[in-house]
């Protein structure tokens, strides 16, 4: 974009794709050039074009026919045949000849496409000039160049378009050509193809079974729920396709793969299993396998998730893709993730393990800002559950939400840290968990403080609540399952007044309503504190935010939580700070 393509790259592109078994077709010369090369003196002209540096070619294109003539006359001096051939063209025709490259020649393109009539992947390297047909053609700065009014008028006149008719669909073609083109377009396969009906929704059970265990991690709960679905069978399990960038075992996908197998076009037995070598992984590969294993390639991972998540509109068959990746390495594939969401692809992304709670593996494997990625990415709804039953509720919701016309892709941020589970009196909390948060310890009306927690530090938050509740009567503990949804709804409420609609109460406002107007909030999560600290702005409350805002390190969990101020003592200190403000 910023200049001309480096000459050395063309052969490099060939090598890369040919090594991978692709057919490479180079379209350098258009039909007019090839016909001219066949005439006396043409071989010398062809050799000159083939050896001309790209930058020189671009500059001459911008300078025009006279510059072409001067340069060619000087370089081909001593070749009467070539000079005679050049002399047959006036300046305008010479410029047209020299810029008749393969990528601008319709006949050349059609012939090349028609010749590739098999299923071998093919790379077309088509030579072009930047800004072809415009006054800025060939100039290295034309990526940011803007044509002035006079240049626009000249372009319009050269195309035979009358002033004021620039936006007419067939403008400048003439009646006969327009009639023929209209008929061609109307009869084309794209115009005649009917839009595929939306495929039926894959039924999702009313509830997912909650994995048993007094103490468990959200990552383990996720893996167990997927395993139970795989074992139970049914349409939902049959439509799930899993993938991971070489972290299948360490993200608890292994059980699902044991049940459903690896996808492979040619069947391949598990050699370790055949040799009776003990292994928890029993990975046979076959055409009906439902797991696609990738190397350490997060960009490919997100490209695959996006493609699988578009199966419904593309092929009329709905798939439910589930991809797991170490949470910090979401950042490696952000471009592919962004464009997948831009295309409204539907998938379940599981980022795990997350945060400094992955204490033993050090800062390179400990995520910090992924909650903010989840909040800021359009087309992606993010959740961070704390308990196994929340994982079950949110996974069930995700498989349903992914299929709704007004739904989106879903991101679950999970952890390998086991936490004690809580006993529920009823299921009333579930609807609020799906909306973004619920009171785990209900505050008294008019309470002056609350602890707001998200994710795996729930144990520290509960311990702090136990210690503080006598000193702070009515203290509440708010368990946020989705900073993303709370913030999104709050923002939409404020935007509504400017869009002509009446502002509607948002979930964050409703949750904080029982607290006193001057109440203080201690917010805490194993991630960027910015994911929760904004909650003070909902009702104008003071905030003492806790979280991670610098790289992690290797250590045991208590030491790391103490160092990064995520432990119970830090929450108590933050609560005390509220009343010193």
Kindly label every feature range from the protein language model:
Residues 1-168, 171-581, ...:
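Thiamine diphosphate
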């Amino acid at each position: 974009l910023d200049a001309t393509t480096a000459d050395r790259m063309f052969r490099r592109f060939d090598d890369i794709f040919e090594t991978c078994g692709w057919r490479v077709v180079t379209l350098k010369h258009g039909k007019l050039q090839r016909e001219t090369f066949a005439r006396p003196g043409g071989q010398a002209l062809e050799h000159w074009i083939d050896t001309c540096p790209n930058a020189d070619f671009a500059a001459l294109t911008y300078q025009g026919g006279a510059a072409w003539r001067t340069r060619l006359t000087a370089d081909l001096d001593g070749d009467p045949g070539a000079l005679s051939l050049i002399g047959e063209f006036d300046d305008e025709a010479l410029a047209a000849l020299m810029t008749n490259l393969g990528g601008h020649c319709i006949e050349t393109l059609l012939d090349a496409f028609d010749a590739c009539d098999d299923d071998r992947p093919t790379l077309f390297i088509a030579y072009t000039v930047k800004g072809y047909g415009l006054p800025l053609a060939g100039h290295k700065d034309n990526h940011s160049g803007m044509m002035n009014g006079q240049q626009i008028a000249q372009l319009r006149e050269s195309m035979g378009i009358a002033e004021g008719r620039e936006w007419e669909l067939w403008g400048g073609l003439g009646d006969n050509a327009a009639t023929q083109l209209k008929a061609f377009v109307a009869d084309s396969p794209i115009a005649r193809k009917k839009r595929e009906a939306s495929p039926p929704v894959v039924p999702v059970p009313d509830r997912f079974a909650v994995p048993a265990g007094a103490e468990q991690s959200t990552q383990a709960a996720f893996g167990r729920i997927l395993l139970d679905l795989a074992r139970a069978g049914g349409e939902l399990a049959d439509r799930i396709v899993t993938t991971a960038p070489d972290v299948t075992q360490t993200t608890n996908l292994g059980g699902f793969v044991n049940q459903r197998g690896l996808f492979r076009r040619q069947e391949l037995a598990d050699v370790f299993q055949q040799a009776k070598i003990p292994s928890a992984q029993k990975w046979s590969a076959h055409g009906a396998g439902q797991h696609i294993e990738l190397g350490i390639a997060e960009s490919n991972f997100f490209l695959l998730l996006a493609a699988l998540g578009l199966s419904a509109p593309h092929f009329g068959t709905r798939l439910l893709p589930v991809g797991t990746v170490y949470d910090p390495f979401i950042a490696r594939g952000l471009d592919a993730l962004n464009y997948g969401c831009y295309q409204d692809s539907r998938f379940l992304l599981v980022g795990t393990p997350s945060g400094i709670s992955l204490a033993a593996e050090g800062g390179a494997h400990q995520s910090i800002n992924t909650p903010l990625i989840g909040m800021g990415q359009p087309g992606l709804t993010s959740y961070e559950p704390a308990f196994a039953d929340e994982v079950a509720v949110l996974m069930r919701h995700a498989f349903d939400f992914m299929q709704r016309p007004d739904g989106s892709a879903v991101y679950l941020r999970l952890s390998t840290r086991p936490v004690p589970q809580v006993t529920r009196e009823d299921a009333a909390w579930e609807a609020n968990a799906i909306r973004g948060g619920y009171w785990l310890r209900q505050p008294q009306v008019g309470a002056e403080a609350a602890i707001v927690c998200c994710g795996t530090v729930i144990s520290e938050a509960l311990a702090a609540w136990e210690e503080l509740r006598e000193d702070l009567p009515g203290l509440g503990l708010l368990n946020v399952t989705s900073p993303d949804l709370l913030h999104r709804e709050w923002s939409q409420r404020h935007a509504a007044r400017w869009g002509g609609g009446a502002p509607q109460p948002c979930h964050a406002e409703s949750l904080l309503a029982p607290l006193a107007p001057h109440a203080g909030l201690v917010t805490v999560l194993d991630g960027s504190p910015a994911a929760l600290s904004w909650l003070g702005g909902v009702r104008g409350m003071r905030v003492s935010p806790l979280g991670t805002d610098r790289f992690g390190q290797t250590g045991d969990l208590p030491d790391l939580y103490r160092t990064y101020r995520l432990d119970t003592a830090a929450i108590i200190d933050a609560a005390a700070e509220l009343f010193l403000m």
